[in-house]
Amino acid sequence: MGEVTIHAPLPDPFRFDDGRSVHTVADWDARREEIATRLLAVQYGTMPPAPEETRVETGSWEALPDGRRRRVDRLQFAPVRGAGRTIPLELTLTCPSGVELARSAERCPGHGTNGLPAVLYVGRKTHEAALSRGYVVVNYPNDMLEPMEIGQAIRGPARAAYAALVGDDAFSWGSIAAWAWGAHRAIDHMVSLPEIDAAQLAITGHSRNGKTALLAGALDPRCQVVNPAGSGCAGAGSYLVLGAGSEDLAALTSRERWWAWTAPGFEAFAGHEDTLPFDQHWLMALVAPRPLLRTEGTQDTWANPVGTSAAFLATQPVYDLLGAPEANTIHYRSGGHDHTEEDAGVFLDLCDATFFGKPMLNDPARVLDGTPARERLFEWDAPRR
């Protein structure tokens, strides 16, 4: 793993901006809102609420050779009703085959009682493992709202429409926030569908799409299981704890790379990480008490596996306060920057455990070897319940 750099102790999430301490769950609810506001203002940029109008063109089901069904629903978001400008998004819904559904109902009693559990998969790839477990998969092609062009001053259809109709300075959102906003719009659609159980939604994505899944899931309690995979910098990885060769804030916000992903001005913290008012365990604490799983490769050096492990440890006290200590999870596998069958299997085990009470088939709470001891990372703890 090599040398681990600790720029500063990980900040205390239990201290309000005015210096007061969190003592109760009610205090945390207020502090949670404060943290969300700070993270958006400083790191990701502020984002608009739901559009004033959404038009939906429901696609026709296509029977697939393997017995599954697929359709494409076309959505048009109007930031301002009647303004004549909309933002298009296509969501691909895939339903499991009858054989897969029967097998899932046998394995998980209650499966499909109020509609099927569903996975919102950020990106265009098919999530085969979820379908085989009896989950509806909704593919969210986030690049329709905001392209992924390295080193460019990106402004995709979503941000451009809001700038034109609401005002150029109305929202400071970067690309990750724009993608998360689109994920929320996809969830708006999912919870309206009779095929889907709105109480059994999970979100996942890998790499930049893992950053999206984490931010979207942190801000939207309708995501009952949140799984960022290999999300690294601006995702589940710490800015303050870095393994040798891991992406840091300077690399992320370089004008030659992905500076457009974050809020304007966030690059000012590059090289001055010790002045950051937060670290990524604050973002992950917003998911609590809902189940949160990071899936990581031990050789995925650029994604900062040791920093992700450190941030996992620093998220735990919030889960402890909220009475859900086992819902904060992490899983490491051998290998590099990929979204593997092993990752998917652990994620779906957690979904089955959450939605159907199935036992976990593995221990997803293993801290990466070489992670600095907790007392080197932070000294604060959850208030006593």
Predicted regions and their residues:
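Cap/lid segment of the alpha/beta-hydrolase catalytic domain
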Residues: H111-E195, G232-V241
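Aromatic-residue-lined binding/catalytic grooves and analogous aromatic/hydrophobic interfacial grooves
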Residues: L93-S97, A183, D188, E267
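Primarily recognizes the serine-hydrolase "nucleophile elbow" in alpha/beta-hydrolase
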Residues: R185-S246, H272
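Alpha/beta-hydrolase-fold serine-hydrolase catalytic core, especially in secreted/extracellular enzymes
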Residues: M1-E90, C95-L101, C108-N114, A263, ...
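Flexible loop/turn segments at secondary-structure boundaries
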Residues: H127-E128, L145-M148, G210-A213, C233-S238, ...
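Mobile cap/lid helix-loop segments that gate and shape the active-site cleft of serine hydrolases
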Residues: P228-L283, N304-F312, V318-A324
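Loop/turn elements at helix/coil->beta-strand transitions in domains of secreted/extracellular proteins
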Residues: G115-V119, R133-V136, D197-Q200, P221-V225, ...
